[in-house]
Amino acid sequence: MRAISILSGGMDSAVATALMMDEYEIHAITFDYGQRSARMELEYARRLSEHLGIEHTTLDLQWLGRLGGSVLTAGGDIPSPSNLDDTVECLETARKVWVPGRNLVFTSIGVSFAEAMDAGAVIVGWDLEEAETFPDNSEEFLDAFNRLLEIGTLDGVRVVAPVIGMTKREIVEAGHEVGLPFELTYSCYAGDRVHCGVCESCMRRRRAFELAGIDDPTEYRE
């Protein structure tokens, strides 16, 4: 069976894709929506796809970034939470980096690709840790989306989220177990060649490797 993977270049979608390699013939898609990290995300998604031996397509969604509403696309200081376990603080961080309707748009486009290519599934990297502050990463969102697809697709395309019940630590452990080269993943909001080390995404990445006790191949500026 074929599947479409929404591959951002980050480790969550990378591990989700790697975990599904034995089950599906995968075609990865990556979006350029005007985010600061677009150049790096596209590069790493392409390199990882080459490593995995899967097809990869880049899609231009510049209009989504032009809507504004996020420091990832409209400029401004990228927030750096002082405590990743402080839900209130991380909720405020999430509001600043939230891109309006991003997962709705990405997943819907993935479904369109799946229907057009006779693929039965769309693979996403939604996870338990991010679901605490991003509701469009939650199991509730997944279940609701799949209920919608029962009506909105002809052949019953499903969204598959293999890491949705995992923390970042567990994602690193799962990726390590299947031999995923984490050096071919990129997580930083800032978009520089070297990870900044202080945005929330970098902080969660670094902590995940530390908690897992697995060597982190990432170079951080701070």
From Swiss-Prot:
Its EC number is 6.3.4.20. Zn(2+) binds at C188, C196, C199, C202. GO terms for molecular function: ATP binding; ligase activity, forming carbon-nitrogen bonds; zinc ion binding. The keyword Cell inner membrane does not apply. Keywords: ATP-binding, Ligase, Metal-binding, Nucleotide-binding, Zinc. Pathway: Purine metabolism; 7-cyano-7-deazaguanine biosynthesis. The keyword Transcription does not apply. It is an enzyme of class 6 (ligase). Gene3D superfamilies: HUPs. It catalyses: 7-carboxy-7-deazaguanine + NH4(+) + ATP = 7-cyano-7-deazaguanine + ADP + phosphate + H2O + H(+). Binds 1 zinc ion per subunit. It comes from the Archaea. Its cofactor is Zn(2+). ATP binds at L7, S8, G9, G10, M11, D12, S13, A14, V15, A16, T17. It holds the Pfam family QueC. Belongs to the QueC family. Catalyzes the ATP-dependent conversion of 7-carboxy-7-deazaguanine (CDG) to 7-cyano-7-deazaguanine (preQ(0)). HAMAP family: QueC. This is 7-cyano-7-deazaguanine synthase. The lineage of its organism: Archaea, Methanobacteriati, Methanobacteriota, Methanomada group, Methanobacteria.
